[in-house]
Amino acid sequence: MKIWVDADACPGVIKDILFRAAERAEIAVTLVANHAMRIPPSRFIQLVTVSSGFDVADNEIVRRAAPGDLVITADIPLASEVIDKGALALNPRGELYTEHNIKSILNMRDFMDTMRASGVQTGGPAAIGQSEKQAFGNQLDRLITKYHKR
């Protein structure tokens, strides 16, 4: 299993959790972004910088992700694409996207987009708090443990 991170939108606190997990579990974590960012020196952590543009980083993640890999993203269409390839998708709040729930989540996202386009103020998600960080860390640990038991 490799971990791919949609890094442009991933909160720093979540990246920090991923960096610690990479070292602890000796698992490859690759951040994909359209701008340079700091990463800790590690043989398990790397940054792939892609050109700017709509969905360029997403397309690179879809291209590289393989069945059994884990993709960290809040981008629901990206999650849907990698799930179709057999990868797992986890959002920064600890919610695991699966083939069983991704279609309904994608439908809700599309509905909210339609509402916003018609002028309805829907607001955005709250900042990531301690409970979301804990949920993410717990779900990540479960997935890594499951992978290592194979």
From Swiss-Prot:
PANTHER family the record matches: UPF0178 PROTEIN YAII (PTHR35146:SF1)
Family: Belongs to the UPF0178 family.
Name of protein: UPF0178 protein Shew_2726
The organism of origin for this protein: Shewanella loihica (strain ATCC BAA-1088 / PV-4)
